[in-house]
Amino acid sequence: MRKLKILVVYANHGGCSYYRQLSPMKMMQEMLPDKVEVRYTDNPLEINPEKNEAPPPDKLKDMNWADIVFVANILKFGGPYTARVIGMGKELGKFVHFDTDDLLTGLYEEHHLYDTYKDNKLDEITKFCYYNADLVTVTQMKFAHRIKPYIRKCMAVIKNVIDYSLPAWNHPKTKAKFTRVGYAAGIHHRGDVKVFNAIPHLVNQKVGRENVQWNFYGHPPPDPSKKGTWEAQVWPEYMSHLLRGFKGGKNYNIHYALPP
C-alpha cells in the first residue's frame, strides 16, 4: 500500500509551529512509518526572494509530491504568499489543511501584532484560507464558534500536542517553605501580562516578600542584529508590564533562554 504523503508548511520553529505541526507530525511518522511519509518546508512555492522568481506550478517539487498540504498560520513570506500556497494546493488537487492557534480575524487591539494584521489586511487573507481549506483546525471550541461563518468545508478542534520526549521528572516534595507556581503567557498578548502583574503584588503583600521568590524564564539573550525590530522591542515592553507588580525590594530573577 502506498504511503500517505504529507507536506508540512511551517512559518518558523517557534511554539506555534512546534506544538501544532513539527512535533505531532514527527510523532506520527515515528508511529506509522509504513503508512505515512512527511516532508517539511517553509517555502513550498520555491520563490527566490532576491530575484523574485519561482518555478511554474508543475515544477514545484514538494507541492506536486504531496497528497496533503498542511499549512499553519501566516507564513514567513507574508499573507499573500500564504493564500497562494492554499490556492496552489487546491489547483494541484491536494487536500489542504489549514491550522491556527491564534484568532486572526477580529483581532483584539491589545495583541502585539494588531497594527500589522490591520495594515496588511491579514484578517481578510485568513478568511480566504478558512474558506478554501478542506480542513481547518483550531485549539478550542470558543475559537471554533467565532470563525464558523468563514468555514466552507470541515473544522475540528485539536489541542496542542504533548511532547513525550521532553524530560518529565517527578520531583520529590520539598520541605522548604517555598511553593513553586508556574505561569505561561505569550509575548503577543499584552492583556495576559497586564492581568498577571497584579498577582506578584498581591502575593508578596499577603505572605511577605521574604517568603516568595519569583523566577521568569524565556527572555532571549540580547541580539544586536535584531535592534529596532519588533522582536527586540517586545521583550522590554513585556517585562515592564510584568514587573509593575513588584513594589519594594527585588525578590525575582529573570533568566535568559539559552539554546540547547
Give the ranges of each region predicted by the language model.
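N-terminal pre-catalytic "stem/leader" segment of glycosyltransferase-like enzymes
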Residues: 1-76
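Conserved catalytic-core segment of nucleotide-activated headgroup transferases in glycan assembly
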Residues: 12-27, 163-169, 173-259
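Membrane-proximal helix-turn-helix segments that form the acceptor-binding/catalytic region
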Residues: 54-58, 64, 85-91, 104, ...
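A short beta-strand/loop micro-motif in the catalytic core of glycosyltransferases
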Residues: 69-70, 97, 131-141
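An aromatic- and histidine-rich active-site surface loop
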Residues: 72-91, 105, 193-196
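A short helix->loop->beta-strand "cap" motif at the edges of active sites that frequently abuts
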Residues: 91-95, 133, 152-154
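Acceptor-binding helix/loop patch of EC 2.4 sugar-transfer enzymes
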Residues: 97-126, 177, 227-230, 239, ...
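Carbohydrate-associated surface elements
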Residues: 142, 161
